[in-house]
Design a protein with these regions (language model features):
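Small-residue-enriched hydrophobic alpha-helices in membranes
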Residues: 1-128
Length: 128
């Protein structure tokens, strides 16, 4: 289940996922995301609005489908290099740490994301 045509929009979906997986987006998590958005959406006139739209999109997805969306999206964006995917993982780590504590739900979401990235790396290596 792929929701995004642009990789940057998928990354923003991941930011929303990491920030919200503990039930709410802390102010510091939002600030970290907005800072990272300035790099992936240079020239975006209203990053806060774009984030609000991404959060609404994320909340509209059945939580049981989120990992499927993430897994399918990483497969869809297979032209994205492993190093870039790993950078996204480290960005997510920054997001979950922004509020000063890592909840169990955030730790599980990070581990799941890491496993999906690693799994896709294995698939690519096997097919080449």
């Amino acid at each position: 289940m792929v929701l995004h045509k642009q990789f940057q929009d998928f990354v923003l979906f991941l930011y929303a996922h990491m920030a919200l997986c503990d039930g709410s987006m802390h102010e510091n998590e939002e600030l970290v995301i907005l800072d990272k958005m300035s790099k992936i959406f240079p020239g975006e006139p209203d990053p806060k609005k774009r984030l609000t739209v991404a959060v609404a999109e994320y909340k509209s997805i059945d939580p049981a489908l989120v990992n499927t969306v993430i897994r399918d999206s990483f497969k869809f964006f297979d032209q994205v290099k492993f190093a870039q995917k790993y950078k996204i993982y480290t960005d997510m780590y920054d997001v979950v740490n922004a509020d000063g504590r890592v909840e169990e739900s955030e730790r599980k979401a990070l581990n799941s994301l890491r496993d999906i990235i690693d799994m896709n790396a294995d698939i690519r290596h096997e097919s080449h």
